[in-house]
């Protein structure tokens, strides 16, 4: 029962945007930069950071479901450790959205529920499949973060610092999942994941 209460609290905090980071925000060492951007640039960056915030909401749901369904204690611990770092990402993105005068996606409850269901299915398929799903997810997230870094205005050093640290963490999570025995996913599954990601990013940029 205590575990269920704890996991329910994690879900509520992720959806509500009340997550706190354990690590310092990478942007804290940089000066404020929103005044150096035009209104259009701020709207664009806010859209990108809202996408990244949604991605971290989904990451919380995925890791939570996969942690609950893991057979092996070491795999469960690995999922939990990665989820804690993803909480940092979630808090950093939320803070940056506030700096930009924007807000998280209104569809966060939907994103969370969908990601939890996917993570549960992956977890029930076995630890190797679950780890493979983590590895592929992180590979796609790494690619998507690289695209966002290319699309940031040159003056936006704070978002850049956050996304660069997030990308480094995602690469490490993916490598760890592969090293722990994650199996490669079939091409149709990878394509389906990319399609779902496109739907999410298109909607989250605006809503």
Curated annotation (Swiss-Prot):
GO terms for molecular function: 3-demethoxyubiquinol 3-hydroxylase activity; metal ion binding. GO terms for cellular component: plasma membrane. One of its GO terms (biological process) is ubiquinone biosynthetic process. NCBIfam families: DMQ_monoox_COQ7. Its main location: membrane. Pathway: Cofactor biosynthesis; ubiquinone biosynthesis. It is a peripheral membrane protein. The keyword ATP-binding does not apply. It comes from Cupriavidus taiwanensis (strain DSM 17343 / BCRC 17206 / CCUG 44338 / CIP 107171 / LMG 19424 / R1). Fe cation 2 binds at residues 86, 138, 170, 173. Keywords: Cell membrane, Iron, Membrane, Metal-binding, Monooxygenase, Oxidoreductase, Ubiquinone biosynthesis. Its cofactor is Fe cation. Its EC number is 1.14.99.60. It catalyses: a 5-methoxy-2-methyl-3-(all-trans-polyprenyl)benzene-1,4-diol + AH2 + O2 = a 3-demethylubiquinol + A + H2O. Belongs to the COQ7 family. Catalyzes the hydroxylation of 2-nonaprenyl-3-methyl-6-methoxy-1,4-benzoquinol during ubiquinone biosynthesis. It is an enzyme of class 1 (oxidoreductase). Gene3D superfamilies: 1.20.1260.10. Pfam families: COQ7. It comes from the Bacteria. This is 3-demethoxyubiquinol 3-hydroxylase. It is found in: Cell membrane. Coiled coil: none annotated. Fe cation 1 binds at residues 56, 86, 89, 170. Binds 2 iron ions per subunit.
